[in-house]
């Protein structure tokens, strides 16, 4: 009897009883049940009086009899509900009395604390065993309080459980119908226990786990949810009586129903396998579609819930199918992308240096004759390159943007301070010198291209490609002359070098005298003429 409670010390039981909710909530509930019983009794008396008036004065014949017969079940339910409320209030008072008695019998916290303090003092002053007998008496008192607390809790638990089981459960009110002919006839037989054997049956006998869950539901809901696994009812109604999924109790009824279905299927599987699969077929074909139809009807009444559910389902399906579709991308042949390969000129045919449109490269010729400047038409034609450019022509970008040979005169210029003699001004001599210089320059470029090709070149076009007018003959082309206003032989196109001015180039050395013969300082273009008029007359 005291098995669950004897394992705990009396301090635990005393704290649970003295520091709990007390009898206040139970007294309020008992009072409300008494008031509810009085209201049910008053309603029953009103209905009974109304039925008496209808039967005696208001109506006559079969209509009056049908009216009275239709309301008689409801009148009986009102009377029974009033009696149930009275019985429930009485059982609650029994629990209140049991609680009060348990509090009186339970050792208080003060008594338990005093016993422990006394024991500590006796043990501390137990010199030569003089307190042995008082210590034994004190421990015996504590054991007695331990047993008394366990017995008190066991008695209180037994009385409370018996009162709880004796409390009646009020069934829902019956329907007010004219006769039993309006009730649906399912054509299914039931035994005296009320279990349906022709179709989907619930209940039969309660298992230990069913009773455990029933107690949990009752405790969590404070008695508002009563599950009867024996009869297969929830709050007095069969599972199938809950047809509206908008109520939370519908989902609870479905969960309990399928839980008991699983238990019944497991039992039949070991005792009657054929009946087990017939039962499973009925659940899948009849019971489950019925509940699905109820959910569909409920969602149809609330389109926003249906749209939200469909949106979530479609989103998840779209994600799954999208990931599955990625696996098929490897089988799709990719579109052929044409590789852009620049058309390169053979290394042997390319010049060793790039030219800039409008700037003519200087070529060292015999006698230090300056190279002739390109014609304006040639400078304009360098920007219109054809689809298949020839091997010679002007480049498309300045050569100083890339590394390599440069425009022809590097940092280590080999020109000395002693200038050569000026070229003849006659047109015939210049034409002959230019032709010879071009021939030698082409030979030198071919040799240098074969020896070392930089590899940073562009396509070249011919000067006369894409133009209506033919390029001028070499003998009529003006020669390129270095100007004092330019950067040496690669000066501005169309300028003429001033013959009277000595060109500044590189470092100069002094005569080998007492002051030395080494380089002193670079020659700066201090002898250039900065007068704009002088510059214009030589253009």
UniProtKB/Swiss-Prot annotation:
BP term (GO), one: response to host immune response
Ranges annotated as biased composition (Basic residues): 443-455
A Pfam family the protein falls into: PPE
Subcellular location, record wording: Secreted
Disordered: annotated span: 179-203, 433-459
Keyword annotations from UniProtKB, A to Z: Secreted
Record has Transcription regulation as a keyword: no
Gene3D superfamilies: PPE superfamily
Family: Belongs to the mycobacterial PPE family.
Record-linked PANTHER family: GLUTAMINE-RICH PROTEIN 2
The protein's name: Uncharacterized PPE family protein PPE20
Organism: Mycobacterium tuberculosis (strain CDC 1551 / Oshkosh)
This protein's encoding gene: PPE20
């Amino acid at each position: 009897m005291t098995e669950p409670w004897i394992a705990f010390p009396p301090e635990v039981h005393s704290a649970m009883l003295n520091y709990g909710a007390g009898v206040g909530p139970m007294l309020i509930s008992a009072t409300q049940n008494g008031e509810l019983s009085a209201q049910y009794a008053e309603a029953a008396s009103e209905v009974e009086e109304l039925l008496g008036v209808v039967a005696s004065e208001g109506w006559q014949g079969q209509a009056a009899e049908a009216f009275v017969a239709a309301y008689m079940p409801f009148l009986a339910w009102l009377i029974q509900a009033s009696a149930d409320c009275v019985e429930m209030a009485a059982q609650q008072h029994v629990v209140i009395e049991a609680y009060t008695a348990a509090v009186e019998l339970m050792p208080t916290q003060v008594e338990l604390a005093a016993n422990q303090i006394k024991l500590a003092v006796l043990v501390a002053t137990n010199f030569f065993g003089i307190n042995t007998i008082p210590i034994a008496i004190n421990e015996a008192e504590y054991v007695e309080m331990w047993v008394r607390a366990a017995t008190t809790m066991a008695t209180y638990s037994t009385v409370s459980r018996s009162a709880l089981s004796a409390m009646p459960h009020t069934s829902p009110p019956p329907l007010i119908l004219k006769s039993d002919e309006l009730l649906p006839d399912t054509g299914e037989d039931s035994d005296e226990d009320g279990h349906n054997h022709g179709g989907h049956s619930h209940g039969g006998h309660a298992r230990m786990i069913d009773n455990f869950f029933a107690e949990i539901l009752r405790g969590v809901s404070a008695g508002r949810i009563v599950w009867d696994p024996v009869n297969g009812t929830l709050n007095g109604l069969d599972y199938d009586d809950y047809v509206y999924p908008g109520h939370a109790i519908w989902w609870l009824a479905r969960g309990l129903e399928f839980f008991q279905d699983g238990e019944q299927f497991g039992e039949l599987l070991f005792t009657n396998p054929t009946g087990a699969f017939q039962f499973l077929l009925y659940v899948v074909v009849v019971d489950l579609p019925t509940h699905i139809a109820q959910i569909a009807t409920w969602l149809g009444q609330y389109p926003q819930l249906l749209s939200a559910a469909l949106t979530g389902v479609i989103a998840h399906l779209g994600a799954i199918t999208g990931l599955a579709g990625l696996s098929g991308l490897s089988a799709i042949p990719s579109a052929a992308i044409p590789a852009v390969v620049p058309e390169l000129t053979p290394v042997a045919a390319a010049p060793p240096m790039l030219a800039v449109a409008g700037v003519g490269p200087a070529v060292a010729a015999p006698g230090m004759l300056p190279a002739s400047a390109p014609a304006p038409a040639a400078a304009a034609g360098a920007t219109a390159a054809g689809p298949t450019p020839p091997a010679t022509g002007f480049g498309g970008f300045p050569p100083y943007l890339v590394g390599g040979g440069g425009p022809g005169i590097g940092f280590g210029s080999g020109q000395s301070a002693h200038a050569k003699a000026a070229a003849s001004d006659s047109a015939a001599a210049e034409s002959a010198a230019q032709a010879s210089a071009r021939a030698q320059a082409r030979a030198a470029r071919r040799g240098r291209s074969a020896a070392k090709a930089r590899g940073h070149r562009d396509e070249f076009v011919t000067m006369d490609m894409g133009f209506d007018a033919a390029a001028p003959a070499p003998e009529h082309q003006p020669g390129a002359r270095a100007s004092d206003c330019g950067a040496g032989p690669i000066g501005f196109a169309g300028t003429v070098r001033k013959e009277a001015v000595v060109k500044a180039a590189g470092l100069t050395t002094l005569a080998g005298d007492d002051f030395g013969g080494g380089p002193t300082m670079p020659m700066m273009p201090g002898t250039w003429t900065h007068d704009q008029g002088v510059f214009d007359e030589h253009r």
